[in-house]
Amino acid sequence: MPPKKKVVGLIKLQIQAGQANPAPPVGPALGQHGVNIMEFCKAYNAATEAQRGNVIPVEITVYEDRSFTFALKTPPAAKLLLKAAGVPKGSGEPHKTKVAKVTWDQVREIAETKKEDLNANDIDAAAKIIAGTARSMGITVE
């Protein structure tokens, strides 16, 4: 078994799917760790091509020899809720002013998408987490 590579950094970014480029925030974050920025951008864009239009969080693990691996996460719940509700952004005063409504079916669908990243045992618990996010954004769940 080959020796394990030593991890020197963990970078978390949220980038538009298929649109990573060396400009900030990607370039500076990777540059500090000496990662080949273009190599990452090409790999990320290829991996997220099918999900264009979504913001996809990524965790990049940087090793001592400047190589890297990355793990893609599911899109943020807030972005999925905004898309489902059809509004550009959440409420400035979430508990006073409501900006939109989503159905429990939509919340369940988002929970299905996010299940692997959520700390929930079943789909009902995951749906409650998503409903809480909706509430804090001024979106009513019916």
From Swiss-Prot:
<dbReference type="InterPro" id="IPR006519">
    <property type="entry name" value="Ribosomal_uL11_bac-typ"/>
</dbReference>
<keyword id="KW-0699">rRNA-binding</keyword>
<comment type="function">
    <text>Forms part of the ribosomal stalk which helps the ribosome interact with GTP-bound translation factors.</text>
</comment>
<dbReference type="GO" id="GO:0003735">
    <property type="term" value="F:structural constituent of ribosome"/>
</dbReference>
<dbReference type="GO" id="GO:0006412">
    <property type="term" value="P:translation"/>
</dbReference>
<keyword id="KW-0689">Ribosomal protein</keyword>
<keyword id="KW-0694">RNA-binding</keyword>
<dbReference type="Pfam" id="PF03946">
    <property type="entry name" value="Ribosomal_L11_N"/>
</dbReference>
<dbReference type="GO" id="GO:0070180">
    <property type="term" value="F:large ribosomal subunit rRNA binding"/>
</dbReference>
<dbReference type="GO" id="GO:0022625">
    <property type="term" value="C:cytosolic large ribosomal subunit"/>
</dbReference>
<dbReference type="InterPro" id="IPR020785">
    <property type="entry name" value="Ribosomal_uL11_CS"/>
</dbReference>
<dbReference type="InterPro" id="IPR020783">
    <property type="entry name" value="Ribosomal_uL11_C"/>
</dbReference>
<comment type="similarity">
    <text>Belongs to the universal ribosomal protein uL11 family.</text>
</comment>
<protein>
    <recommendedName>
        <fullName>Large ribosomal subunit protein uL11</fullName>
    </recommendedName>
</protein>
<dbReference type="Pfam" id="PF00298">
    <property type="entry name" value="Ribosomal_L11"/>
</dbReference>
<keyword id="KW-0488">Methylation</keyword>
<dbReference type="InterPro" id="IPR020784">
    <property type="entry name" value="Ribosomal_uL11_N"/>
</dbReference>
<keyword id="KW-0687">Ribonucleoprotein</keyword>
<dbReference type="InterPro" id="IPR000911">
    <property type="entry name" value="Ribosomal_uL11"/>
</dbReference>
<dbReference type="InterPro" id="IPR036769">
    <property type="entry name" value="Ribosomal_uL11_C_sf"/>
</dbReference>
<dbReference type="InterPro" id="IPR036796">
    <property type="entry name" value="Ribosomal_uL11_N_sf"/>
</dbReference>
<comment type="subunit">
    <text>Part of the ribosomal stalk of the 50S ribosomal subunit. Interacts with L10 and the large rRNA to form the base of the stalk. L10 forms an elongated spine to which L12 dimers bind in a sequential fashion forming a multimeric L10(L12)X complex.</text>
</comment>
